[in-house]
Regions:
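An acidic, low-aromatic, low-complexity terminal/linker signal
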Residues: 1-155
Length: 155
């Protein structure tokens, strides 16, 4: 990942996060999420977007936030082998970051389960956590979601 990125900045709970715009397919408002019983804790369901079945991830659940209310916006991102919809409260802006406004994520904030917390940036004097969206799912989680999505396509 180069130092200069244009992130799509969004709010989840009280925090701001960003994802490289090159990985974002679209931003959708109020999609109809169909709940899937017995799915992974942070998969809130699936959505049929222009004929394509896409799993929906609750970032509040993934990040263990107390506020579990549903967001009004969905950011569709392209992972290496699939697409996933990220439930967010609000899309703030498409930012433009200079290299001197980006720092590595402090080591104290990173664990084996938070490898996706990539870097931190300052946009308009606000801290934005930049997500490495390719690491948001473990290989095992990604495989489970891929298999589930394939099953849904075949039904």
């Amino acid at each position: 990942m180069s130092d200069y990125i244009k992130p799509v900045v969004f709010k989840v709970g009280n925090e701001m996060y960003g994802v490289d715009i090159n990985l974002v397919q679209s931003i959708e408002k109020q999609v109809n999420v169909v709940p899937v019983p017995n799915s992974m804790k942070y998969i809130s369901g699936i959505v049929n977007l222009r004929g394509e079945v896409i799993p929906v991830m609750s970032l509040k659940e993934k990040f263990n936030m107390e506020d579990q209310s549903k967001g009004d916006n969905t950011v569709i991102v392209n992972l290496p082998d699939m697409k996933i919809a990220l439930e967010v409260d609000e899309v703030i802006e498409i930012g433009e970051l200079q290299p001197d406004k980006i720092s590595l994520m402090p080591k104290l904030a990173k664990t084996e389960n938070t490898e996706y917390l990539d870097r931190v940036a300052s946009i308009d004097n606000k801290l934005v956590i930049l997500l490495d969206i390719n690491k948001i799912l473990s290989e095992e989680e990604a495989q489970g979601i891929k298999e589930f999505t394939e099953q849904m396509k075949n039904n």
